[in-house]
């Protein structure tokens, strides 16, 4: 990850890392300094003789830069150490690999707390990449721009691996996402596809000089990682020529995609659902007692099939909380599935706000507020309230040059949505707290507002 800090490196111990590959630095993060602080033994050891008291299983570190860092291999030097004997050993290792063995310990983003290491197998990610590529109709003639992080399933599976299985050209616009760099790559490389989370597409569409880029070669891609606002999807299709843009839904624990829209789905379906279930995957919607609901009824979405992870690494308790004895992955998402099999994600089970006994779904309010011409992005969540149990709060990023107030928001909502769904509190911000993969962290927004407003959590029986 490009946003790592020393406290996050507990992963080295958690998953018993034996070899670590690192860049020298990225933006404000100096990885070499972090590692030398954590592993002082590096200063006095040979690269192949690392013995770290805090990380006893770590055998060696490889750094990709040009510096000769004490105790570490340079990537190029390490590559040159390989000989014919090593190649022969690799062939032997390859013959002993099995499809159900772990290939990736993928840490979840942690929108609600400490990340967990999802154990993904060869079967999990290779097949998921294959079906995603087929949904996008990727071929050897396509050129896919991948500005999303490669340390996340979005970049690794839906980007790199999907290109490998289809023979598609990969285009990387930069070390990290930059809207201008991405637009320039799309234009110069005549890309036919591009991936991104909603905030990335929003950033590109709002770039100064957006109209100067020729994006007519584009046709497809995936927008995923967070709920896609309807108005944003319409702009992506009309202004970026992505008429075959797909929406994908899933989670790290399901390798990641379980639902995806087709390139020829009606635009109405693509802006209002996450598509239909992927091949060889099952889905169901259940109520709080676990009863399977009828078509169109709302409840928690469960998925099952080849794509479900083996479990959280060395964490059977949290694995059992997420995957039941019948193999169903409990997604934590509220959803409906219609008679044609299209799934609509209503929100997170934990994000649902209960105001005065009324169930309020933040995404519904977010979709409505995004129709306001002065609002660029919005996140809605609940905060404690002595009278109603919870009240509605909205964090808003305004369009450039616009000012938004609580009165503006309330008057815009008045008569258009139910009174109990109208935000009681509004905070105008320039950005949201996000995970490194671009997902808004509502729990941090909730904590900030609770503290700023001096609210107290209401105790319930």
Explain the meaning of each model-derived region.
Residues 126-143, 153-193, 207:
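Conserved AMP-binding/adenylation subdomain of ANL enzymes
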Residues 54-58, 63-69, 73-107, 114, ...:
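Conserved pre-ATP/AMP-binding loop-to-beta segment of ANL
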Residues 79-83, 183, 188-196, 205-269, ...:
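Gly/Ser/Thr-rich phosphate-binding loop
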Residues 9-13, 20-24, 194, 289, ...:
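AMP-binding/adenylate-forming catalytic core of the ANL superfamily
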Residues 85-88, 99, 104, 118-139, ...:
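Conserved structural elements of the adenylate-forming
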Residues 1-6:
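Short, small-residue-biased leader/transition segments that mark boundaries at the very start
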Residues 16-19, 40-62, 143-145, 171, ...:
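Conserved helix-loop-beta element of the AMP-binding
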Residues 59, 418-439, 458-461:
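AMP-binding/adenylate-forming catalytic domain of the ANL superfamily
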């Amino acid at each position: 990850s490009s946003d790592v800090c020393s406290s996050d490196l507990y992963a080295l111990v958690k998953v018993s890392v034996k070899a670590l590959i690192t860049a020298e630095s990225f933006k404000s993060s100096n990885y070499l300094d972090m590692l030398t602080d954590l592993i002082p033994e590096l200063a006095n050891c040979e690269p192949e003789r690392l013995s770290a008291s805090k990380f006893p299983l770590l055998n060696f570190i490889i750094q990709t830069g040009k510096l000769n860092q004490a105790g570490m291999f340079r990537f190029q030097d390490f590559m040159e150490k390989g000989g014919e004997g090593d190649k022969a050993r690799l062939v032997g290792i390859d013959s002993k690999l099995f499809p159900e063995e772990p290939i990736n310990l993928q840490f979840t983003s942690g929108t609600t707390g400490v990340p967990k290491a999802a154990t993904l197998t060869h079967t999990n990610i290779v097949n998921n990449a294959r079906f995603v590529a087929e949904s996008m109709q990727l071929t050897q003639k396509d050129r896919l721009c991948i500005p999303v992080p490669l340390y996340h399933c979005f970049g690794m599976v839906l980007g790199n691996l999907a290109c490998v299985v289809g023979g598609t050209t990969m285009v990387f616009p930069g070390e990290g996402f930059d809207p201008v760099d991405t637009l320039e790559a799309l234009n110069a490389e005549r890309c036919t596809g591009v991936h991104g989370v909603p905030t990335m597409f929003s950033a590109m569409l709002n770039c100064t000089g957006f109209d100067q880029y020729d994006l007519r070669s584009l046709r497809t891609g995936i927008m995923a990682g967070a709920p896609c606002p309807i108005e944003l999807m319409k702009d992506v299709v009309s202004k970026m020529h992505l008429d075959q843009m797909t929406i994908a839904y899933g989670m790290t624990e399901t390798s990641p995609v379980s639902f995806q829209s087709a390139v020829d789905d009606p635009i109405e379906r693509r802006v209002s659902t996450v598509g239909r279930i992927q091949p060889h995957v099952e889905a169901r919607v259940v109520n709080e007692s676990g009863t399977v609901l009828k078509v169109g009824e709302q409840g928690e979405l469960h998925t099952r099939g080849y794509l479900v992870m083996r479990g959280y690494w060395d964490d059977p308790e949290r694995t059992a909380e997420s995957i039941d004895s019948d193999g169903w992955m409990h997604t934590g998402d509220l959803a409906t599935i219609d008679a044609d099999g299209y799934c609509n994600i209503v929100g997170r089970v934990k994000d649902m706000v209960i105001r005065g006994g009324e169930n309020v779904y933040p995404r519904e309010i977010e979709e409505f507020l995004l129709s306001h011409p002065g609002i660029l992005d919005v996140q809605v969540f609940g905060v404690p309230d002595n009278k109603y149990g919870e009240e509605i709060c909205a964090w808003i990023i305004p369009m450039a040059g616009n000012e938004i107030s609580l009165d503006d928001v309330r008057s815009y909502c008045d008569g258009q949505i139910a009174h109990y769904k109208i935000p009681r509190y509004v905070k105008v911000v320039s950005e949201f707290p996000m995970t490194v993969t671009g997902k808004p962290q509502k729990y941090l927004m909730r904590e900030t507002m609770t503290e700023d407003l001096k609210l107290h959590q209401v105790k319930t029986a």
